Amino acid sequence: MAKTDLARRVYNHTWKLDPIIRSLLDTDFYKLLMLQMIWGLYPRVDATFSLINRTSSVRLADEIDEGELRAQLDHARTLRFSKKEMIWLAGNTFYGRKQIFQPEFLAWLHDFQLPEYELRRKDGQYELHFHGPWTHTTMWEIPALAIINELRSRAAMKNLGPFSLDVLYARAKAKMWSKVERLRQLPDLKISDFGTRRRHSFLWQRWCVEALKEGIGSAFTGTSNVLLAMDTDLEALGTNAHELPMVLAALAKTDDELRSAPYRVLQDWNRYYGGNLLIVLPDAFGTAAFLRNAPDWVADWTGFRPDSAPPIEGGERIIEWWKSKGKDPREKLLIFSDALDVDTIEETYRHFEGRVRMGFGWGTNLTNDFAGCAPQSIDGLKAISLVCKVTDANGHPAVKLSDNPQKATGDPKEVARYLRFFGNEERVEQLVRV
């Protein structure tokens, strides 16, 4: 693939010819996996997704021009899946399985369009909501976040000249490559790109993916970005997300339905997928509550993705649970993905080496680490913690508790109710940077 002169591309400001979202495949693979299940099992559920800026000190509406934001959101709504993309989805092998997407689902997907959005400014922030059928609003999460993060990067670099931009990208590349050299020292490492939603830009994410592909070879197992997977002949990777148990819990009519919501999600998932896609995401309402109430069959799944507890602490908790169920952790898989960088990856890898199979999903600190790279300090180049979460389902508020109270989302009264119901044990307060 031809190399792009990133500094020159930024300096030319040719944004009308260079939209942020180029394709509906410019999303995380698990959104398509989840979408097929939602389409098949929950086609009549409405769900609202909302932008949440957890770095509240950053006033997004003061940094990003509203007209530019609307133009990019409007452009994303014009996109449709191309013939080439549909053929690739239908014919490619994912996780060792052919035709993972049903023909009826692909026929429906052919005419898919992102739904309308609701945008307004309030107190220096943007309120951005997506209302409508869950089958449609779920697909806004990744492009909305990518658009806002890239617009913020563009605004921060707007006044830099060509030499300053050259220096910026040269330093960022050197910084990234120094991480590659450290990762090479970890034998049998398995790591993938999870950095789409908070990336500096699409072109920078592509550079990082190509750098990892060359730099660490087979240790780089693929990318969550479907478009990049298709374009670079990499594996498209991803399992499932918190929105599934959040929606089912919001729809629960009884305490039993609320308690069983996380496990019903897994049963639904197992109807569609198997093997290495049988990865449990346990922390939507706290990992302690999940493990305490989990049916025995959950221990038969391939692995867990501890997403909000400190990685070593969270991994140890799951290993002990596997042992209590008579399972050998060496035959199981832990996928670490929360705010990872090289130090955390090295520490976690060495702690668990030989005790459990490991994979690492490297996100924001892969695709948006420009700290200290600009010739002068630019706050707008520092990554922020921005999420787009489901906030209601069929008019009922949706809640995420997380293992880190700083990551909890939802109406405060509902969060308090869920805490009373699921418990508050073993949740660890940590500063959320990304």
UniProtKB/Swiss-Prot annotation:
Superkingdom of the organism of origin: Bacteria
Keyword Phosphoprotein: yes
Keywords for the protein's UniProt record, in alphabetical order: Ligase, Phosphoprotein, Pyridine nucleotide biosynthesis
Modified residues (Phosphohistidine): H242
EC number(s) stated in the UniProt entry for this protein: 6.3.4.21
Pfam families: NAPRTase, NAPRTase_N
Biological processes, Gene Ontology terms: NAD biosynthetic process via the salvage pathway
Bridged cysteine pairs (disulfide): none
Entry's family note: Belongs to the NAPRTase family.
Role: Catalyzes the synthesis of beta-nicotinate D-ribonucleotide from nicotinate and 5-phospho-D-ribose 1-phosphate at the expense of ATP.
NCBIfam families the record matches: NAPRTase, PRK05321.1
Protein name per the record: Nicotinate phosphoribosyltransferase
